Amino acid sequence: MGSDRKIRVVVGGVFDIIHAGHVHFLKMAKELGDELIVIVAHDETVKKRKGRPPINPAEDRAEVLKAIRYVDDVVIGKPGEISLDLIKRLKPDVIALGPDQDFDCEDLKRKLKSIGLNVEVIRLPYLYKKDRAKTSKIIERITEIFCD
């Protein structure tokens, strides 16, 4: 008999103001396996990486993500860079990176291998209109429309 184990896909990100680009990304990631787990960046991590706090706190971002049909579970990450301990606990078969995430796939694979994980790391392409599928662009448009 074959294994009944589901293929687990893990993605991570800020997911601050959810837009169609996020939904397309999550849909494509879900198509890589049976189960999709999202790691939401901790508020401190967002502030450090982007130079500003997120618009929405991690708990709210997680709640919105849980409502998206492609997402099976959501975990809030720890402050700082990617937690290899958290990834080890989640036991992914695949990690899907977004097109704008600045991780090197091969470097990430090496780090995962060093802790005993043989995980496929895949970079997904932009699936939606690049100029409309970025939170920073949405914030710019909001300030242009409402702050003039």
Curated annotation (Swiss-Prot):
In the UniProt record, the signal sequence range is: none
The family database entries (SUPFAM superfamilies) matched by this protein are listed as:
Nucleotidylyl transferase
Q: Which InterPro entries match?
A: Archaeal_FAD_synthase, Cyt_trans-like, FAD_synth_RibL, Rossmann-like_a/b/a_fold
Single Gene Ontology MF annotation: ATP binding
- Provide the cofactor list for this protein: a divalent metal cation
User: Which EC class is the enzyme in?
Assistant: transferase
Pathway stated in the Swiss-Prot or TrEMBL entry? Cofactor biosynthesis; FAD biosynthesis; FAD from FMN: step 1/1
- One family from Pfam that matches here is CTP_transf_like
Summarizing the function annotation, the protein's role is: Catalyzes the transfer of the AMP portion of ATP to flavin mononucleotide (FMN) to produce flavin adenine dinucleotide (FAD) coenzyme.
- PANTHER family in the cross-refs: FAD SYNTHASE
The molecule here is called FAD synthase
Q: What is the lineage of its organism?
A: Archaea, Methanobacteriati, Methanobacteriota, Thermococci, Thermococcales
